[in-house]
């Protein structure tokens, strides 16, 4: 069984930053990631980061990703891609599926930096082709150069929904409406203003009634909701669209931690079920730490700091 001083699961901003920091102090470090490319969400993000200079403000996400990869390579970090960690055990052992093979590794310490997954809202027709998450839209646009659709309705007015709406329009898509069940916009005013100036109508206190179509999305009906988020009869509005894009938050990908018996807690402010950990990311499992969105939903800059 191969042994490393430090095993990191996830080559996103948190995992790579942790690997760079650790490798600079001498330990042997390996990072496993299930994707073909490292960098996590960073390479989907073409917008500039906010914050201070030490948080890489005014630098585009994909540029930050390239910087982290260069720093990791220079530090001697071993990054193994197309490697899915399918098991985590209390004796600091991980089981990794690489190709058709299963391999076991042990570490003196393990950092789980698996990030988060997109939430979805269910409604009649939500499983039709053409209903996608905002992260999927970013992947199609910014990684593969593919338009997710021509006429798009965006559900969610947080920063992700606003930024992705603007990126879709920059690429030639028509965003027919931006819808949110909340009574006010959830994202930064600067992002909302950019979308509004493009003529996109905002429907606040509204949500989706149903997606329409047989084999794929052909249209969508929305309606106003009351303070208890119940549909108000007679307020329905129809849009002809081929894509419904959802930006309704993220949930930590904590499955490995649960598998190993890590103590968890429900914390809606941090995205749902998260591991109980201290300020250093120490979990209830000896030698197992967490960093990034798996410990609570934050920005990529926060993940790198952790």
What residues fall within each predicted segment?
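Residues forming the flavin
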Residues: 1-306
């Amino acid at each position: 069984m191969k042994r490393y001083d430090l095993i990191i699961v996830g080559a996103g901003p948190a995992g790579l930053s942790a690997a760079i920091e650790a490798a600079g102090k001498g330990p042997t470090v390996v990072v496993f990631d299930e994707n073909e490319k490292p960098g996590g969400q960073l390479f989907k993000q073409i917008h500039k980061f906010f914050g201070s200079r030490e948080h890489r403000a005014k630098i585009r996400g994909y540029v930050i990703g390239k910087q982290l990869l260069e720093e990791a390579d220079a530090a001697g970090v071993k990054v193994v891609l197309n490697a899915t960690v399918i098991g985590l055990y209390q004796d600091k052992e991980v089981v990794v599926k690489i190709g058709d093979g299963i391999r076991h590794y042990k570490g003196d310490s393990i950092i789980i930096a698996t990030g988060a997954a997109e939430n979805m809202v269910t409604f009649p027709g939500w499983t039709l082709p053409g209903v996608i998450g905002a992260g999927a839209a970013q992947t199609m646009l910014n990684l593969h150069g593919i338009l997710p659709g021509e006429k798009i309705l965006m559900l969610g007015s947080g920063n992700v929904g606003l930024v992705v709406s603007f990126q879709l329009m920059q690429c030639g898509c028509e965003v027919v409406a931006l819808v949110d069940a909340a009574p006010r916009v959830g994202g930064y005013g600067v992002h909302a203003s950019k979308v509004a100036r493009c003529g996109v109508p905002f429907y606040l206190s509204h949500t989706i009634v149903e997606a329409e179509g047989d084999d794929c999305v052909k249209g969508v009906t929305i309606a106003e909701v009351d303070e208890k988020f119940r549909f108000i009869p007679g307020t329905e509005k129809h849009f002809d669209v081929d894509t419904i894009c959802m930006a309704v938050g993220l949930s930590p990908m904590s499955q490995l931690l649960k598998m190993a018996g890590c103590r968890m807690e429900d914390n809606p402010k941090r995205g749902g079920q998260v591991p109980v950990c201290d300020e250093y990311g120490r979990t209830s499992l000896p030698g197992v730490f967490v960093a990034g969105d798996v410990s609570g939903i934050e920005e990529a800059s926060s993940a790198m700091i952790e």
